[in-house]
Every structure is written in C-alpha cells, then in structure tokens.
C-alpha cells in the first residue's frame, strides 16, 4: 500500500512485479483523523488523497 503521490514507490514496486489491485479513494482523510501530521501535499506538489494497493504476481 502506498499513497497516490509516491511515484518513487510505485516505480519501485512495479519494477519488481507488483501490480495495482485497488485504489482506495480519499482513504488518507480517514488516516489523517488518527494521524493529523500526514501532510496535505506530497511529492512533486501532488495532493495526498488516495491509497494504492499493490500485489505481487507469482
């Protein structure tokens, strides 16, 4: 699982055979309720909103 702004993580996992299996829209809002220090804006100025679920192909 990573957030929508984290292009480095998406590159890393996909190069190692992971595929996208789900996008949990607006999931970070719920996470911020528990951890308010999660920033609103992430890498490259991209708003942090969604969680992206990845799974490795076997």
Task: Label each residue range with its predicted role.
Residues 1-9, 19, 25-33:
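Conserved beta-strand-loop-alpha-helix junction that forms the acyl-donor binding cleft
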Residues 12:
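Long, contiguous binding/interaction regions
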Residues 22-52:
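Conserved acyl-donor/pantetheine-binding loop and adjacent beta-alpha core of acyl/acetyltransferases
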Residues 53-57:
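Short, well-ordered beta-strand micro-motif
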């Amino acid at each position: 699982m990573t957030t929508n702004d984290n292009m480095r993580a998406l590159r890393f996992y996909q190069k190692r055979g992971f595929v996208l299996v789900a996008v949990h829209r607006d999931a970070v809002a719920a996470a911020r309720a528990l951890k308010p220090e999660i920033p609103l804006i992430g890498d490259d100025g991209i708003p942090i909103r969604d969680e992206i679920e990845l799974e490795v192909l076997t």
